[in-house]
Amino acid sequence: MIKKLLRVTLVIGLLLLASCTPETEYTHAIPKNASVVIGMEVDDMVHKAGLNGQEGEKVLTQLKALVKGGLQGEASQLAERIIDQPSESGLSFNDKVYLFATPHAEAFGILAKVSDEGKLETLIEMLEKESIASPLREESGCQWTEAGTALCAFNNGTFLLLQPSRGNASTMKGTLLSLMRQKEGEGFCALPEFQKIEVEGNDMASVMNLSAIPHEMTTPLRMGLSADIRLEDIKYFITANFESGKVVVNSESLIQNPRILSFFDTMDQVIQPIQGKYLDYYQGNTLIWAGGKITGKELYHILSFNPTIKQKLDNPPLPVDVESIFSSIQGDIAIGFDRKSSKKFLFYADVTNSDFLKTFEDLRPLLALTGGQITLDNVGSHDYMMDTYYGKYWFGVKNNRLYVTTDRTWAEEVGRTYGVSIGRKPWASEVKTNRLYASLNMAEIPKYRTKVTGDSSIDYAINFLRGSCVFLNVSMTDWRHGKAELVLKDKDTNFLEWLVSILKK
């Protein structure tokens, strides 16, 4: 069964190598309420992956052996013809392949253009002989079949694959045929955001909103949201481009809800462009660095409008005056995590005064009741060490800088700058053009730790990436625009070509 499903997946992947006519009627089949729609420039991506040259032939040879494994006679010959000449599949995708998801990830779909209905029918019949697909049935002006856990339908212009996230594929039949019957103006392509996906120049372009999140995860997300704000209102346009030595993802807000717009316009005043004061206060081998610039008092008041957050601010684990701490912060903030231990960190923030430290002095009578389980010691005129259940914390104010750290040496060296610092990184100049900036130093992920998160699949990915990547950076110029960039050690090879070379091994 697994082998059959693998062949279905590989065949669908092969279909993405096909060419297509300039007609776009097939886009009518995208559901209007889709929570995620992704348009892929398959032809460009195949070229960037280096699958058109001699190296590509080696990959296709390996692919032939994998796909043909277990196939006999005509089925084996057809599989080889499709790999050699993708148009033999009956599908054509030089323009775009579309992937989509329905609200709350209840179903996923792949949409493509049919160039030759007869050839596609032959392909489906071959899958039927291999017991991968059910016999073709004709209904509502199209033919459809059940293949594994998915349903497929096609006519003389459109190929649609639909797969539910749970349950039997046959339950999606009504939805499948309904989408195949959609006309101009009835589907997602009638919405203005679809035109952004259609603009050329991106390898992948997508529009997505928060209704894509599964039902079980929406309740905590909606806590504190106004009743007139729907998850569908929070939507973004996201692009991905595969370049030499890196992949770059950009995001742009498509939010139109007046309440949300007003909130984020206010946040633009509270979270301001970073000055970059603390770049030289962290060593160059810091594992994670993040920075921003905030007006703490205004940020506290904004956060307090959310009932859930306000409850946490009003009832912290220790009875300290959280508002006074926030209100003292005015300017750059930064935090760095050590490459050998995620529990070892150093936080800095510009502050206007140290008056808020009195709130910790007021804790002493309460801490005395813990029988020594939590202690607070003075280690300087405005410096403290708190020993808690979770470890030791050093904090205080020096030269109008609040610091918090879990390391004694870092506490003793507060204010120290380094010659080989974060400020020497190639991306350091970008920090000052953003309001938020974070960097993961991939090369410094502990090489001796095979278990990083405890999740085997995530750990495998991390261990795989750390040997090939330099850094992963995420930034925001304002609330409307964000960027993520994963950079390889190999600066000359396109990211997709590098990925294919890994798969070959």
Where are these regions (language model features)?
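Short, hydrophobic/aromatic-enriched beta-strand segments in well-ordered soluble domains
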Residues: 112, 164, 251-256, 400, ...
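Sec-dependent bacterial lipoprotein signal peptides
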Residues: 1-18
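Active-site acidic/histidine clusters and adjacent loop/turn architecture
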Residues: 106, 349-350
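An internal, short helix-loop-strand segment that often contains or flanks glycine-aspartate motifs
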Residues: 56-95, 128-244, 315-319, 379-480, ...
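Short, surface-exposed ligand-recognition loops at beta-strand->loop->(often short) alpha-helix junctions
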Residues: 112-116, 350-356
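Beta-propeller and related beta-repeat scaffolds in trafficking/envelope systems
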Residues: 358-385
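Structural boundary/hinge residues at secondary-structure and domain interfaces
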Residues: 20-132, 138-146, 189-239, 243-343, ...
